[in-house]
Amino acid sequence: MKASMFLALAGLVLLFVVCYASESEEKEFPRELISKIFTVDDFKGEERECKGFGKSCVPGKNECCSGYACNSRDKWCKVLLGK
């Protein structure tokens, strides 16, 4: 009788350990997925980053932020006037 109680208790402890390990892996998966999504968004933000006032630019490439235009003479972003 003592042996069967010991085996039952050991089985419950083993079940608890297995459940705890699988639950902790499930909790980490969404965190990893979210962090990968945000790193992809950060990368896209770097690709589409616009240039602000006074930054050098290439005329005709539309690199300046909205409200600014690349000046062909000076080759830097200036405030867009009259359009």
Curated annotation (Swiss-Prot):
Expressed by the venom gland. It is found in: Secreted. Its main location: secreted. Keywords: Amidation, Disulfide bond, Ion channel impairing toxin, Knottin, Neurotoxin, Secreted, Signal, Toxin, Voltage-gated sodium channel impairing toxin. The modification Leucine amide is found at residue 81. Residues 1-21 form the signal peptide. Belongs to the neurotoxin 10 (Hwtx-1) family. 14 (Hntx-1) subfamily. Weakly blocks the rat SCN2A/SCN1B (Nav1.2/beta-1) sodium channel (IC(50)=68 uM) and the insect sodium channel para/tipE (IC(50)=4.3 uM), without altering the activation or inactivation kinetics (depressant toxin). This is Mu-theraphotoxin-Hhn2b 2. It comes from Cyriopagopus hainanus.
